């Protein structure tokens, strides 16, 4: 991999995409953002969906021509797959693989299926990645406000010899070069992304919040107190870290809180936890996690669905819903309730 570099607007040229038709496969959170941003950057964009998709009319209402996936791929010279990881292989095999032409660019926003060999593209196409480091609605909002979400780009297969230029042009088209586009590889992006999700951002933080809440409840404290101290205030602390690192957070809290941070943090995240984190990373690197997740999907997701029901039924979720209902400034999405 080349030395880490950040690319901005002046480093990318939309002309690499000007004469190409871009097919966005999927019109969910990332799909709608990519399609709209590319279109408003002056590029020729169509949308590919399966017949009967609920997103079909939504995409049409935004002014896009919508086709079944195979027909969209046949027309396009650039194909971006923005489908859930677990669905990509099936749709690729059924509708994408045989409709790619020599010299096409096949894009991904996450390296899972390439890195774990679920999808093996033909040798005569470019295989590229643009991975925005933010959810689709933020990618869209930043673009409309004249900014952009930073992205990672990778070139897995460079048949045309222009893979880097095409990837950077795509990144510019969705606004990424406003925030900066950094180089990576499919391997690095996949392994670090999965580790971050599992050990820190999703698995780690949810388990930490639940453990703190349960500890206070078991000690006889009210559900409301436990929720506010272990869950509600999390956003305020994370916002400070997001804005100025841990230093700004520690500057902003009381000295008592800062002292508690120093003397207790490493008691919780101790050597045993760090050793377990290394095991988690190893399972990502050696493919164990991917194998288990793919098998879970092949068998109808029994453990996944059971755990989803259990977690949704936790007391902390019910208390949180009630308390958030008292906070008029929180715009809660009813579909998540």
From Swiss-Prot:
| PROSITE patterns, per the entry | KARI_C, KARI_N
Domain KARI C-terminal knotted: where? 185-330
For molecular function, the Gene Ontology terms on record are: ketol-acid reductoisomerase activity; magnesium ion binding; NADP binding
| Active-site residues, record numbering mapped to chain | 110
Q: Which UniProt keywords apply?
A: Amino-acid biosynthesis, Branched-chain amino acid biosynthesis, Magnesium, Metal-binding, NADP, Oxidoreductase
Domain of life, per lineage: Bacteria
GO biological process terms held by the UniProt record: isoleucine biosynthetic process; L-valine biosynthetic process
Q: Tell me which cofactor or cofactors this protein depends on.
A: Mg(2+)
Write down how the cofactor binds this protein.
Answer: Binds 2 magnesium ions per subunit.
Q: Does the keyword NADP apply?
A: yes
What positions does the entry give for NADP(+) binding?
Answer: 27-30, 53, 55, 85-88, 136
What positions does the entry give for Mg(2+) 2 binding? 193, 229, 233
User: Which reaction does this enzyme catalyse, per its entry?
Assistant: (2R)-2,3-dihydroxy-3-methylbutanoate + NADP(+) = (2S)-2-acetolactate + NADPH + H(+); (2R,3R)-2,3-dihydroxy-3-methylpentanoate + NADP(+) = (S)-2-ethyl-2-hydroxy-3-oxobutanoate + NADPH + H(+)
Q: Tell me its EC number(s), please.
A: 1.1.1.86
Return the Gene3D superfamilies for the record. 6.10.240.10, NAD(P)-binding Rossmann-like Domain
SUPFAM superfamilies hit by this protein: 6-phosphogluconate dehydrogenase C-terminal domain-like (SSF48179), NAD(P)-binding Rossmann-fold domains (SSF51735)
Pathway as given in its UniProt record? Amino-acid biosynthesis; L-isoleucine biosynthesis; L-isoleucine from 2-oxobutanoate: step 2/4; Amino-acid biosynthesis; L-valine biosynthesis; L-valine from pyruvate: step 2/4
Would you tell me the Gene Ontology cellular component terms? cytosol
Question: What the protein does?
Answer: Involved in the biosynthesis of branched-chain amino acids (BCAA). Catalyzes an alkyl-migration followed by a ketol-acid reduction of (S)-2-acetolactate (S2AL) to yield (R)-2,3-dihydroxy-isovalerate. In the isomerase reaction, S2AL is rearranged via a Mg-dependent methyl migration to produce 3-hydroxy-3-methyl-2-ketobutyrate (HMKB). In the reductase reaction, this 2-ketoacid undergoes a metal-dependent reduction by NADPH to yield (R)-2,3-dihydroxy-isovalerate.
* Family, per entry: Belongs to the ketol-acid reductoisomerase family.
**What name goes with this protein?**
Ketol-acid reductoisomerase (NADP(+))
Q: Which organism is it from?
A: Clostridium acetobutylicum (strain ATCC 824 / DSM 792 / JCM 1419 / IAM 19013 / LMG 5710 / NBRC 13948 / NRRL B-527 / VKM B-1787 / 2291 / W)
Q: Which gene encodes it?
A: ilvC
